[in-house]
């Protein structure tokens, strides 16, 4: 079952050695089944054979990594090669010709993608950025046209080139062309700026959908070590033509969920990773069967350390039926090392927490970089230096306010943050964990102010135990919100990802427009698409910057003309959130039909 998809550089991954992993300090109940086999020296299932099928030496396009979960809960990573992102130009003025298409291709090489460098050649005559080009006819989704238009389609060797070209040609709506009328060629860039969406649409796969592969080029049993580039149980290479969706398999593979929360010693204001240490990492490991978290089999773990000669950590308050495992380290670096070992052993599919995207995970990654602990620098299933540094994200709201935050990528693992999830579906006076837990769970947070954390940690073993219980309580509340019947976040993400055919990571951070666009692109591939089998493309649009002076006014709703469609022919609507769906249903009409009739 597909968990995540990412695109990396064009370098083909070479065969790796897979030494036996060291024995984990954790019991079998915390370890994934496949990892447990490796620790005991038992073999596991191989995918395909050892022989590598080398790609075309002149075509080393981007590698697409598919992360998934097998029915036995083991993780798998497949490198897919041979799929190239495409960039399209719609010809809205002038005459399309192969000569013009080639001239624009040369312009792309020399100006749009050259970045001041001389384009290198594959075999003496093929440019580096463009793999191939072709002319085709297709429909434009916006603006709507009754007849297909001419398009130039370019297959690119780099995934990031798609968005670069789209942004470049948006600023150049016309180009000089001696063969077109008036010597001017009008163009509109069309593209999914996300090359992974192109791959998923072309392959017919969806988020959390089942995928099969044939002719696996090579496979590796992941007898993992801390130096490997991937921590999955199985790895292999395959051509993109061998990827097939399994549409008749509706089951949801068991998912490994990990709730997480951290506590830091803060000075004034928010803590900073380069100065303020992490003193406690609280984690709850559990499983989600058919998208529903199993509440009866949760493992509570506390990672902590204490000042030298301070007496360690006292007995953590707990209920009679509750068990808590405490991993007490000598210092912060040793605590991070133990936590990294736990991540490798348990191999979670989903992280859950309140503001885990905006604080906990970026802070852990940044702090691990400061301490030099490899195991936590990469909280995803891919270990490379380029993925270890959190990125600064700037969001602009409708009122013009901007907000900056850090985000750490975790390839192969989903970050399910209860804070933005609830903000998108509920309107609350306060979105703090305490307020939300009190309203939906009937249970509030323990009252420990941030200014009290430092003194309590230094005071005594008993006060440190109180902080550990406080941290673990936050993890429980976050998981409680994720499992609450009002949200059912894991099941909601799984089913919505399958329905909209959008991968989970993109689903959680994008709006409704991306969902609708992906649905239309997938539907346009079906043989019964009206009016023909030609593809449908969306133009690339740059987001318009907003200022505080912008004013927003609600739309005026007008009743459409009756009789645009027969009453025995129902229609489907795809509006986001407005009155139009109810108007369409009551009058059995659409605004597009009325527009066509009037013109």
Feature-to-residue mapping (PLM):
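Long, charged/polar, low-complexity intrinsically disordered N-terminal extensions
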Residues: 1-153
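N-terminal accessory regions of nucleic-acid-interacting proteins
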Residues: 2-23, 29-31, 129, 138, ...
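Short helix/loop capping segments that flank catalytic or ligand/cofactor-binding pockets
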Residues: 165, 267-269, 292-293, 362, ...
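Short secondary-structure boundary/capping segments
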Residues: 170-171, 273-278, 360-375, 380, ...
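Alpha-helical interaction scaffolds
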Residues: 203-256, 262-336, 340-344
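Active-site-proximal helix-loop-helix substrate-binding element of RNase H-like nuclease domains
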Residues: 298-303, 307-326, 330, 347, ...
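Proline-aspartate-enriched helix->loop->beta-strand connector
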Residues: 339-363
């Amino acid at each position: 079952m597909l968990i995540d998809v990412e695109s990396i550089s064009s370098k083909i991954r070479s065969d790796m050695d897979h030494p036996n992993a060291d024995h984990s300090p954790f019991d079998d109940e915390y370890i994934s089944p496949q990892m447990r086999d490796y620790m005991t020296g038992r073999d596991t299932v191989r995918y395909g054979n050892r022989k590598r099928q080398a790609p075309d030496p002149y075509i080393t396009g981007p590698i697409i990594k598919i992360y998934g979960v097998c029915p036995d809960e083991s993780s798998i990573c497949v490198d897919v090669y041979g799929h190239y992102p495409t960039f399209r130009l719609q010809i809205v003025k002038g005459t399309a010709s192969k000569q013009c298409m080639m001239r624009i291709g040369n312009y792309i090489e020399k100006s749009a993608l050259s970045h001041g460098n001389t384009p290198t050649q594959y075999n003496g005559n093929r440019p580096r950025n463009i793999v191939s080009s072709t002319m085709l006819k297709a429909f434009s989704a916006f603006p709507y046209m009754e007849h297909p238009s001419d398009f130039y389609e370019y297959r690119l060797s780099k995934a990031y080139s798609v968005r670069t070209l789209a942004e470049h040609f948006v600023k150049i709506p016309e180009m000089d062309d001696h063969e077109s009328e008036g010597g001017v060629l009008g163009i509109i860039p069309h593209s999914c700026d996300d090359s992974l969406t192109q791959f998923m649409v072309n392959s017919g796969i969806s988020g959390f959908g089942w995928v099969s592969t044939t002719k696996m080029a090579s496979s590796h049993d992941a007898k993992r070590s801390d130096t490997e580039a991937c921590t999955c149980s199985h790895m292999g290479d395959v051509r993109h033509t061998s990827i097939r969706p399994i549409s008749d398999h509706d089951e949801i593979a068991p998912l490994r969920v990990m709730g997480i929360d951290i506590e830091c010693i803060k000075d004034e204001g928010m803590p900073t990773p380069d100065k303020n240490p992490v003193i406690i990492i609280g984690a709850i490991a559990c499983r989600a069967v058919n998208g529903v978290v199993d509440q009866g089999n949760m493992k509570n773990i506390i990672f902590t350390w204490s000042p030298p000669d301070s007496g360690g950590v006292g007995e953590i308050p707990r209920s009679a039926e509750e068990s808590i495992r405490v991993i007490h380290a000598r210092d912060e670096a040793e605590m991070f090392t133990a936590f990294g070992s736990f991540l490798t052993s348990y191999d979670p599919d989903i992280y859950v927490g309140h503001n885990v995207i905006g604080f906990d995970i970026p802070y852990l990654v940044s702090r691990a970089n400061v301490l030099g602990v490899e195991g936590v620098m990469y909280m995803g299933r891919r270990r490379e230096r380029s993925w270890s540094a959190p990125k600064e994200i700037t969001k602009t709201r409708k009122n013009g306010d901007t907000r900056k935050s850090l985000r750490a990528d975790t390839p192969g693992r989903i970050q399910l943050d209860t804070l933005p999830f609830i903000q998108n579906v509920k309107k609350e006076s306060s979105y703090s964990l305490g307020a939300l837990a009190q309203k939906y769970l009937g249970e509030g947070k323990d009252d420990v102010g941030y200014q009290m954390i430092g003194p309590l940690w230094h005071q005594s073993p008993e006060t440190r135990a109180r902080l550990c219980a406080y941290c673990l309580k936050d993890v429980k509340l976050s998981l409680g919100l994720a499992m609450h019947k009002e949200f059912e976040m894991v099941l909601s993400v799984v089913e919505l990802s399958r329905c909209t055919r959008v991968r989970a990571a993109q689903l959680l951070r994008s709006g409704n427009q991306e969902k609708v666009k992906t649905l239309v692109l997938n539907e346009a591939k079906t043989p019964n698409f009206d009016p023909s089998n030609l593809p449908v493309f969306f133009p690339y649009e740059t987001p318009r910057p907003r200022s505080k002076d912008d004013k927003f006014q609600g739309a005026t709703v007008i009743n459409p003309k009756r009789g645009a469609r027969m009453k025995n022919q129902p229609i489907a609507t795809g509006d986001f959130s407005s009155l139009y769906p109810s108007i369409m249903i009551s009058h059995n009409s659409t605004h597009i039909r009325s527009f066509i009739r009037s013109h």
